[in-house]
Design a protein with these regions (language model features):
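P-loop NTPase catalytic phosphate-binding loop
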Residues: 2-25, 37-226, 230, 243-244, ...
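Beta-sheet ligand-binding and adhesion/scaffold domains
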Residues: 249-260
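Short, surface-exposed amphipathic charged segments that create phosphate/polyanion-binding patches used
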Residues: 235-242
């Protein structure tokens, strides 16, 4: 996952250092509980500091060194993105940060997004943006129609540079939909990024056993806090370091080559 090498302001470095200190305190069980976590810098401030992004760049967060973590939407190699974590770890907040950042950094002619969720009320704040295609409740007929139309668009999408983000909040729920919708969703996982459709999907880590056959579709996996080491290892494919030490709703980790990259979410 590439990072954009802009200069990082002192505030970003200080916040990153605070997260690092808290992680060290958590690792030392003899240390008393740390003070409450300070608020993360605002998304608008972070994006203003970064400056204009290339059309193909999707903002995901800020790394420990204060530099932005970006996904190149014109490079399909990473494939669909799976965001795993415990309940309350910030998976929905991650998707919402992506949606808000797109609205602030890109024209709707370049990037749009649609959301599939069990809780559409959580997405009211993004409905006013022209980048928003729709908020689709799991199990509703409109969700089936959206997945079908998106698959058709991807099939015929040969030359356009426009990208569509398919933000799915809870893989297990979508995996239980009707057979035709599930088949089209699987096709989007397999072929979507090469056709400018990017599925970004959340998973409750404790429920991974219910959808274990789906995991092979995700080469790129991002993790929020996972307290159970066995679950973390099963999802990461090896001994994922320190996922239990991540700050809920703020901090995430992904594998970058042979290393693990920690990053944090700005506040929306």
């Amino acid at each position: 996952m590439p990072t954009n090498r802009h200069n990082s302001p002192d505030a970003f470095r200080e916040f990153s250092q605070t997260l690092q200190t808290l992680a060290e305190l958590k690792a030392d069980t003899s240390t008393p509980p740390a003070k409450p976590m300070p608020a993360a810098p605002a998304l608008s401030d972070v994006l203003a500091e970064i400056g204009s992004l290339p059309t193909e760049a999707l903002f995901l967060g800020v790394a420990t060194d204060g530099l932005p973590v970006l996904l190149n939407l014109h490079d399909s190699h990473p494939g669909p993105i799976l965001i795993s974590g415990d309940a309350g770890s910030g998976k929905t907040a991650f998707l919402q940060t992506i949606a808000h950042s797109v609205a602030q950094t890109h024209d709707s002619e370049d990037i749009q997004f649609g959301v599939i969720t069990n809780y559409p009320d959580e997405w009211e704040s993004i409905k006013s943006t022209p980048h928003h295609i729709g908020i689709f409740p799991v199990g509703h007929k409109s969700t089936q129609e959206f997945v079908s139309s998106l698959a058709s668009w991807a099939h015929s999408n040969k030359n356009t540079q426009q990208c569509v983000l398919l933000l799915v909040d809870d893989l297990e729920s979508v995996a239980s939909l009707d057979l035709e919708t599930v088949q089209k969703f699987r096709w989007l996982l397999l072929r979507g990024p090469a056709r400018r459709v990017w599925p970004i999907v959340t998973l409750n880590a404790a429920r991974y056993g219910q959808i274990i056959s789906w995991l092979q579709n995700f080469r790129t996996r991002i993790f929020g806090q996972v307290a159970n080491g066995r679950v973390a290892e099963a999802l990461a494919g090896d001994k994922a370091p320190g996922l239990d030490q991540l700050e809920s709703r703020i901090q995430f980790s992904l594998r970058e080559n042979e290393n693990w990259l920690r990053f944090w979410l700005p506040s929306c």
